[in-house]
């Protein structure tokens, strides 16, 4: 049973024919023309890209430089504040040492005041006892006088 070869079907032993070289070149040329702009446009686009990239990088570097300058100024101000705080702490320390010296020089007088206070309390206690004794004596005297 042999198959019939028809106008639609190629014979079984024949392979399909590839397009000719002239057909292939026409297709490639069309693709290249559609994708690739003229060389003058490419050069202009490259210059434009490089100038914009240069502007961008210059801006980035300027921003970074300004950030570092800001940090430097902040560090200087912080350093000045710490110097002021150091001076204030030094003044407080000196004043505290002076107060401690004055307190040490007043210490004997404070001890004398404490001793005098104790003596006054003792004398006051003795005066109350003497007052109580004198009242008892007076009461005895009045009692004896009534007899």
From Swiss-Prot:
Localization in the cell: Cytoplasm, Cytoskeleton, Microtubule organizing center, Centrosome; Lysosome membrane
Source organism superkingdom: Eukaryota
GO cellular component, one term: BORC complex
GO BP annotations, alphabetical order: anterograde axonal transport; anterograde synaptic vesicle transport; lysosome localization; neuron projection development
UniProt keyword terms in alphabetical order: Coiled coil, Cytoplasm, Cytoskeleton, Lysosome, Membrane
Binding partners and assembly: Component of the biogenesis of lysosome-related organelles complex 1 (BLOC-1).
Function (record text): Component of the BLOC-1 complex, a complex that is required for normal biogenesis of lysosome-related organelles (LRO), such as platelet dense granules and melanosomes. May also play a role in intracellular vesicle trafficking. As part of a BORC-like complex may play a role in lysosomes movement and localization at the cell periphery. Associated with the cytosolic face of lysosomes, this complex may couple lysosomes to microtubule plus-end-directed kinesin motor.
Protein's UniProt name: Biogenesis of lysosome-related organelles complex 1 subunit 2
Gene: bloc1s2
């Amino acid at each position: 049973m042999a198959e019939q070869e028809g106008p639609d079907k190629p014979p079984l032993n024949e392979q399909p024919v590839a397009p000719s070289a002239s057909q292939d070149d026409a297709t490639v040329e069309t693709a290249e023309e559609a994708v690739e702009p003229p060389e003058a446009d490419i050069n202009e686009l490259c210059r434009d890209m490089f100038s914009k990239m240069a502007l961008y990088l210059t801006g980035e570097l300027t921003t970074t430089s300004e950030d570092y300058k800001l940090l430097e100024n902040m560090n200087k101000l912080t350093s000045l504040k710490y110097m002021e705080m150091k001076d204030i702490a030094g003044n407080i320390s000196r004043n505290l040492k002076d107060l401690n010296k004055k307190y040490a020089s007043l210490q004997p007088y404070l001890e004398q005041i404490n001793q005098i206070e104790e003596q006054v309390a003792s004398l006051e206690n003795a005066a109350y006892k003497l007052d109580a004794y004198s009242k008892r004596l007076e009461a005895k005297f009045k009692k004896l006088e009534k007899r």
